[in-house]
Amino acid sequence: MPDVIVIGAGVVGAACAYYATRAGLDVTVLDRGPVAGGTTGAGEGNILVSDKEPGPELDLALLSNRLWRDLSTVADFEFEAKGGLVVAETREVRDTLQDLAIKQGVEHQVVPGAGLHAYEPHLAPGLAGGVFYPQDSQVQPMLAAARLLAAARERYGHSALRVRTGVEVKGVSTAGGRVTGVRTGEGEILAPAVINAAGTWGGEVAAMAGVDLPILPRRGFILVTEPLREPLIRHKVYTAAYVTNVASDSAGLETSGVVEATPSGTVLIGASRERVGFDRTTSLPVLSRLAAQAVALFPALSAVRAIRSYCGFRPYCPDHLPVIGADPRVPGLYHACGHEGAGIGLAPVTGLLLSRLLAGEQPDLDLHPFRPDRFAFARETR
């Protein structure tokens, strides 16, 4: 019998499995699809501090950034400490970006308009300036999930970690109000602890245990270009509107210019956000808008072909904070979901914090802001 079952083999579930195995626990990971078959496989691989408001999520991001750098020495998942450049079209927006960077208290360099081309020679002229964040990084998310799982087996014992894909969890088993395991299409698996790392489907898993988590899908599209012969973009580059959209509560369509290159030479173009359920219908108007915004940032992209697009669903929480920790309503149930667009970046810290709880140790950060029952408490106090 495993010590803990992790539901979800995306990058968050993989990180939970890695750190729990490192802590000496026997772990079974279950997923109805393949490893990284959900939101992880539709992500750009961002590890950002630049888009975080000062507070609990930024604290998570800073620790997770350091953990990603450590993990990059354990496994190869195309970790790039490339830095992020946030650009502004007007002086007013530039000043707002500068104020945010100061409040964040993170490493940054304010860049005047005349200095932008030292960072990105192919940027469009006329921008008012921006802020460069050297800590912003990127990984290949599917590689990260797969290789974290592989590293856990190789470093901490093949028998300590079992990964079972194509196995759908049908229910969470309890006795006396406490978790005793899960029910799957292949039978029941017993364990004293279950981690809900089901991402956008985290609310469904929580409901199986009789608790509510208001996690909603927030759709986003990404365009992928043909590989470029010569590097065109050095960093992750995005407009100030991206920061605004990340913090938005709107269910309607919001887009912002986001452009970055990959080690293979392709360019990833985003970003869009909208709450339309799990509708995967390709939206040509959205893709056209993304392409236009990218060309506005980098005019040379007008001569580059887009070869494909894809969409994914970010796990959105109403207060824009992830759900991390033990659920007091059902002892033995732990949550690691609701990270919205920051799941890849926050995966290691999520896994580390939960491994501390499972091992009976003090977490590295205060988990109170991320507690699973905070939404029920908010409703009761209205």
Residue ranges and their predicted role:
Residues 2, 23, 328-382:
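C-terminal lid/capping helical subdomain adjacent to the catalytic/cofactor pocket in oxidative enzymes
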Residues 3-28:
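N-terminal Rossmann-like FAD-binding beta1-loop-alpha1 element of flavoenzymes
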Residues 21-41:
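Glycine-rich FAD pyrophosphate-binding loop
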Residues 44-119, 128, 256, 293-295:
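Dinucleotide-binding Rossmann-like beta1-alpha1 core, especially the glycine-rich loop
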Residues 5-7, 189-201, 205, 351:
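Short hydrophobic core segments
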Residues 131-185, 189-192:
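Helical element adjacent to the flavin cofactor pocket in flavoenzyme catalytic cores
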Residues 18-22, 45-47, 76-80, 178, ...:
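Active-site substrate-recognition segment that forms the wall
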Residues 59, 86-93, 132-150, 281-286, ...:
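Short beta-strand to alpha-helix junction loop
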